Structures are given as structure tokens and as C-alpha cells.
């Protein structure tokens, strides 16, 4: 398959806007790496640079040991799936699948073999003779993926391919893409702003912010040990709760003597213990502001002094607005960050 290497990639437009700044990234052979970040962070631009649709200002791009900076998009052996399905409306599904292969003068028998294989993988055999307008959104996206599969490229690029689908279909397609990529073993880069997609699909995640990589790791590593406050706040639904250490010590008299340098503390909503357990960690006496049922329990927004926390509990609260709620955060479940730099100070 292929190894993608990006070395010191910089992209700056003529108006001076810096989109990507000295970015380094390696995607392993057969890996599915997800680029996740907020809108405008540079993740789609990076994908377009790899595809050859945009030029870098500086830096080197390699697939395996081959430098591809100056190669035309058609010569990079890359296939890309876009947010909009980019299907030819006047062609049948079969026509869309075979179009690129015909342009490359692929033998007819080989075209038929590849289409049959892709259609079976994607379960689209029954509508090969339909036009795109006769298909649902999910079916159109399968056809779009079929177009890249029949190419048999070294690299797949996915640019937010599921953003036009509803939540249920998006979840289903996530599973299908992951299963498909594993079965094909094609090195893949996938762009999304949806952290749930990223956590579901990725072998590894690269969290992008303002054109730079904040952290790279497996989904579990990113969730359990965020390296910056940006990652801690961006990954997780709900995100982490943040609290100034000095405020905690002033109001609760609870001292984190094991890490004097720490300015900022954070904890996940699900790690709290309902009730008062002062031997395990600081106890917060809060007031319920909002309850968000999640089926198995609820997310509860609580007020502590001037701070709003979100906690996750297994109980199903209903009309408890304004009531008092006490909970404990075990000290081993606190993450610690430097408030000035945003960098992690210790693992927990």
C-alpha cells in the first residue's frame, strides 16, 4: 500500500493568511488516520494539498519514498471522496463507477471485474442501472466510495463525506467505512469536525488547531490523556470541566500539594462520585441548573460559585431544577494543565 509523509508543510495565501504552519505528519501503511478540528483549522486544506488540488508554500510531501510535490493530481495515485457526492447526474451508477476507468483506458473485462467487486463490497448491486436522483443520501455516498474503490489507488482521502447525512445514517456509514477500509487495507486520511466520527473511525487521531497539530494518538490516548487544554475541551461530549486550582483551594481549602506548579485542573463529566467522600477528593456542593436526559441517565449542568460544571450521572432526574447536588471528584481523576501555555503538567 503506502506510507504518507508530510515534512514541514506550510501554506500561506497571497493575502498573508497562514493556514498551515510547519506541520509534520506520517500516516502508516494501511492506517486510517483522522484529522479532526473546528471549522477553519486547515484540515481540509491539508487534504487538498496531499491530493494536489492546492500547492504548498514550503515543505515536502512523500508517498512511500517518492516526492510528489510537483506531480499532477492525476499522477499521484490518490482517490478522494468529497462532502458533496460529485456524481454525474446523467449517468447511471454503473456509468459513474466506470467513467474514470474508461478514461484511463482500462480493459473492459477489468472494469467489469472491479465494478462487480466494489458493488458487492458496498451492497449496491441492485441499483447499478439507476440514476443518482433515484438514490437516497446513503446510497449516493456508497456510490461515491465505489468510485474511489474501483480506482484501486495507493491512498484514500475522505473530506467530511458524511456531513450531509442524518445522525442515524452517519453512524451506520461510519461503521461501513471502517469495515471497508480494514478489508481493503488502503492507507487513508479522513477529515471531519465531528469528534464522534473521529473516535469511531480512527486508528489514530490528529487534532488540528489553527493549522498546527495539537496531539496525535489513538482515540483512547486522546481521550484519556489530552496534551493541551484545547484537546481536553474539544474531545469529549460533554467536554472536560476546567477549574482554577487557586479558586478550588480558596473555596474548599483543598490543596493539591503533589503538583504545586499546576494552575488549571480538569475532570471528565463521568468520573465524579455522587455524594460526599472527602477522603477520596474535593467535595462540591452545587445547584442544578439544567438537566439533559441521555436515556441511560443524564448530563447535569450544576453551578458551583460562579463556575458551571457538567456531570454525567446514571440516575434519571426530572424536575430537580434548583435543587442542591453534592459530588466528589477523586483526586486521581484530575488532569492538570499550565494555565498560561495550555500544556499538560502531569498524566492525572
Swiss-Prot record:
User: What GO molecular functions are on record for this protein?
Assistant: ABC-type glycerol-3-phosphate transporter activity; ATP binding; ATP hydrolysis activity
| Residue positions binding ATP | 37-44
Its placement in the membrane is given as: Peripheral membrane protein
Its domain of life? Answer: Bacteria
Family note: Belongs to the ABC transporter superfamily. sn-glycerol-3-phosphate importer (TC 3.A.1.1.3) family.
Summarizing the function annotation, the protein's role is: Part of the ABC transporter complex UgpBAEC involved in sn-glycerol-3-phosphate (G3P) import. Responsible for energy coupling to the transport system.
Q: What name is this protein filed under?
A: sn-glycerol-3-phosphate import ATP-binding protein UgpC
Species whose genome carries this gene: Bartonella quintana (strain Toulouse) (Rochalimaea quintana)
